[in-house]
Swiss-Prot record:
The gene is rimP. CDD domains: YlxS_C. This is Ribosome maturation factor RimP. GO terms for cellular component: cytosol. Belongs to the RimP family. GO terms for biological process: ribosomal small subunit assembly; translation. Residues 198-260 are annotated as: Disordered. PANTHER family: RIBOSOME MATURATION FACTOR RIMP. Keywords: Cytoplasm, Ribosome biogenesis. HAMAP family: RimP (MF_01077). Required for maturation of 30S ribosomal subunits. Pfam families: DUF150_C, RimP_N.
Amino acid sequence: MTDPSAQNPDHELLDEPRLVVEPGVAARVAAIAAPVLQGMGYRLVRIKVSGEAGCTVQIMAERPDGSIQIEDCEAISKALSPVLDVADPIDKAYRLEISSPGIDRPLVRRSDFERYAGHLAKIEMAVAHQGRKRFRGVLQGVEDNAVRLHRDDIRNNDDESEVMLVMEDIADARLVLTDELIAESMRRGKIAEREMKQSLGILPPPPPHAKTDPAKRGTPKPKLENGKKAPGKIPPKNTKEHRLAAERLRRGDIDPIEGE
């Protein structure tokens, strides 16, 4: 018997491992948080432990489609707080913060590099590639176990315009904020919000359209008795003659044109 979850793309994305992970204390928090998030239908993106203004533990999470709402963050915080209190991965008081990955998000999974192909990214390597650790350029997708990057940071003619960066050797990767990225993020956000509202019954489905509704497709326009097609929207009369006549009518000089 086939496992239904194996055919569900959301389950495949939930099970996809992160290739870029955190060291130290953040790794301990990630080991605790990831299973809880996955059980709720979310993916862990990044853990960041900061000592500024006290200790803050920031957990970035998302749905399999890359979206997340304020309600999701509240639900995650409510479920994760008691688990972290029991496991106690940090030996001092801290503030838990649940957030979205943001527009200029970290890239931590293979699907991230594939999804954002065509967008500008910055990549820092844990292992140097041809003597360099930092690269910037347009993502060109993934081939085998490496990210193809078309560089825009070339400084001399000896540098390669395209490089293949092994994903397991990447220490940090994130998108660069551009107008194109902002536009796509807004588009995806609107689509995700619309789908969520429709699934909750808050937003009715879109009305049928003649181009998509089979019942309306090919329906002829009504005709008059003489066989001519009924006119569509009649445009306003805006010839010079009508404008002059309207002005004279307004001044009371003449009667309107016959039939008008």
